[in-house]
Amino acid sequence: MTEKAYYFYVLVCADRSFYGGFTTDVTKRAATHNAGKGAKYTKLRRPVRLLYYETFADKSSALKAEYAFKHQSRLKKERYLIAHGIESTQF
């Protein structure tokens, strides 16, 4: 039996803002956001680009990562992404 993976992901929007989310399929979820069928936030800020994702073994951990990211300042979000290997030129 294959274990299900859960993901916390970060998109960078057309206005250079970040959007953090949770999903079980990162590629499909990013496409949904770009189709205007995702969150209201990204619908108004398309196109979006997948910037970062992290895999978790359980849903709770992925949701906690999403919550923590969403409640940080822009500067802390940038520092988080840089600490996880994303170059600042990508945002």
Curated annotation (Swiss-Prot):
SUPFAM superfamilies: GIY-YIG endonuclease. CDD domains: GIY-YIG_UPF0213. It holds the Pfam family GIY-YIG. It comes from the Bacteria. InterPro entries: GIY-YIG_endonuc, GIY-YIG_endonuc_sf, UPF0213_domain. Residues 4-79 form the GIY-YIG domain. Gene3D superfamilies: GIY-YIG endonuclease. Belongs to the UPF0213 family. This is UPF0213 protein LCA_1266. It comes from Latilactobacillus sakei subsp. sakei (strain 23K).
